[in-house]
C-alpha cells in the first residue's frame, strides 16, 4: 500500500512539473481593428453609424488573472439630424470628426489565463472585464482634448503558446459635449459629470504576441 501511494505521489509530482514547463510571459504587444460608434445628441443608437477603428495594444500581466492594458486607437465618428425622431431647433447639421485616444485599463479575468502548461489550472479561453482612464482628442470646429472613462468586457483566447486573440467592446464616457461639434442644442443647461454629454463605443478584435518571460524561480505575484 505504501509503495502504491509513493508511486501515485511521484506521478502527481511529474504532472505538476510538466504543467509548468512553459514560461509565463509578462508583456503582450499587438494591434487591433474594429468599429467605433458615437452616442450623443445626433445619434441615440449605439449600433448605428459605425465607422472603421484601428488600435495598438499593450498588456502587462500582474498575474494570470489581472493585467494593466494600454490602448491607443483612432477612428471617425459621424452623425446628422437626418433620420432621427427628435426635432432639433437648428438647421440641418452633420459632422464627421476624427477621434484619437490613449487609455490605461485594469483588466480582470474570470479565470486564470494561459495554456495550462505554464500555470496549472489556466484556461485558453476566458472572459474579462475592464475599467480605466484615458484622454481623447477630437477634431472639428471645437476640437480639443477630453477625458475618457472606458468600461468594457471581452474574451481572450490563447491561440498558441505566445499568440493571443482578444475581442472586446468598451464604452468611453466623456464629460465633453463637443465630440459632435454642438453643445446644448436645446439650450437647456444641465448639471452632472456625464449628463447630456457625448460618448462613444468601440468593438475591437486584436492579435498580440507574448514577450518578456518571467523568471521561473520568482514567486512574487500578487493573487
Language-model segment annotations:
Residues 19-59, 204, 208-214, 223:
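Short glycine/proline- and aromatic-enriched beta-strand/turn motifs that initiate or cap beta-hairpins
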Residues 42-46, 81-87, 117-120, 141-145, ...:
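Outer-membrane beta-barrel translocator domains and adjoining extracellular loop/strand segments
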Residues 66-141, 209:
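Gram-negative (and chloroplast) outer-membrane scaffold detector with strong preference
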